[in-house]
């Protein structure tokens, strides 16, 4: 094992991500910075930190307790809430916010106010004469949200960024990335399945910063005329050759010094080896492709045997004094 490489596996404070200090401090990944908290004060495993009601609220199943009707029974939906007893504050990742109410939740600022993408909770906060709407981001449905709540040091996705998203599926996480990069950013969303692709195209009709690409990510040359150079690649493809897939796309579209965020599902790569061995093997493959991993983080308790690896592509050479 390389010196300075200490992947942050397993142990988390409290309930891991929700406990007193979500990510477990220590040195983040490949000699990266410290993994700071990221966890919330919520209780139990219900989505954004609440009782057992689906998306993380109490019995009504919502993330925001600020007026509005109670849901029907456990886990019922509550509609758009007015944020009287709710406070939204910026997370340390630019473009991501924490909604503090009776329970805390991770949220993003809705690019298309009034529109819910996958039935997620929304909350409106009055700022002067304006109302700003935020959307709850469930870490059990999004690897990126799980990584943020687990205390990942950097996601490199921020307002104005151009992001290539491989394995976009129906666009659950893509919609939140679209919120983060905002009107000045772009999300190129690549998905091979035509059924999911239909959802993605419908999503892009309302969110003009999403460009859906219904193609196989193994063949970036087929869509090279659709995509400009990007700042970040996010990959959630769950394929045995996923590092090769990401590398092919990085060589074609990722600028030198750009970053990658890869979600690794150990079972999809080698179901016979331990998760730690699979992660270490994938990291080695990345290093052979001019991809320099800087941080590794497991996604417990939200996903089992998953890890996220964050790194830089073709970093500029260090200047010797």
Curated annotation (Swiss-Prot):
- In Pfam terms, one family for this protein is Fibrillarin
Provide ranges: composition bias, Gly residues: 7-70
Please list the GO terms describing molecular function.
ATPase binding; histone H2AQ104 methyltransferase activity; RNA binding; rRNA methyltransferase activity; TFIID-class transcription factor complex binding; U6 snRNA 2'-O-ribose methyltransferase activity
Cellular compartments annotated: Nucleus, Nucleolus; Nucleus, Nucleoplasm
Q: Which GO terms describe its cellular component?
A: box C/D methylation guide snoRNP complex; Cajal body; extracellular exosome; fibrillar center; granular component; membrane; nucleolus; nucleoplasm
Task: Please indicate which superkingdom the organism of origin belongs to.
Answer: Eukaryota
- What's in the keyword line of the UniProt record? Acetylation, Isopeptide bond, Methylation, Methyltransferase, Nucleus, Phosphoprotein, Ribonucleoprotein, RNA-binding, rRNA processing, S-adenosyl-L-methionine, Transferase, Ubl conjugation
- SUPFAM superfamilies reported in the protein's UniProt record: S-adenosyl-L-methionine-dependent methyltransferases
Q: What is this protein called?
A: rRNA 2'-O-methyltransferase fibrillarin
């Amino acid at each position: 094992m390389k010196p300075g490489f200490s992947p942050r596996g397993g142990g988390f404070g409290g309930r891991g991500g929700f406990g007193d200090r979500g990510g477990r401090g220590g040195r983040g990944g490949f000699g990266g910075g410290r993994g700071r908290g990221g966890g919330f004060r919520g209780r139990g495993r219900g989505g954004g930190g609440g009782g057992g009601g689906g998306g993380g609220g109490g019995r009504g199943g919502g993330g925001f307790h600020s007026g509005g009707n109670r849901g029907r029974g456990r886990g019922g939906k509550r509609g758009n809430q007015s944020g009287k007893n709710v406070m939204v504050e910026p997370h340390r990742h630019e473009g991501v916010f924490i909604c503090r109410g009776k329970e805390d939740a991770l949220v993003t600022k809705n690019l298309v106010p009034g529109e819910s993408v996958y039935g997620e909770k929304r909350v409106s906060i009055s700022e002067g004469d304006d109302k700003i709407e935020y959307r709850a981001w469930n870490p059990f449905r999004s690897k990126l949200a799980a990584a943020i709540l687990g205390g990942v040091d950097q996601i490199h996705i921020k307002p104005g960024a151009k992001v290539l998203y491989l394995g976009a599926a129906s666009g659950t996480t893509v919609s939140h990335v679209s919120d983060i990069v905002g009107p000045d950013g772009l999300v190129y969303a690549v998905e091979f399945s035509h059924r999911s692709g239909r959802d993605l195209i419908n999503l892009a009709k309302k969110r003009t910063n999403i460009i859906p690409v219904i193609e196989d990510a193994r063949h970036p040359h087929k869509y090279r005329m659709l995509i400009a150079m990007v700042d970040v690649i996010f990959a959630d493809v769950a394929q045995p050759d996923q590092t090769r897939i990401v590398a092919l796309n990085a060589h074609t579209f990722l600028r030198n010094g750009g970053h990658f965020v890869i979600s690794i599902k150990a079972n999809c790569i080698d179901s016979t080896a331990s998760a730690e061995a699979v992660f270490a093997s994938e990291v080695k493959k990345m290093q052979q492709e001019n991809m320099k991993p800087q941080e590794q983080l497991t996604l417990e308790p939200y996903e089992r045997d998953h890890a996220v690896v964050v790194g830089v592509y073709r970093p500029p050479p260090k200047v010797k004094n």
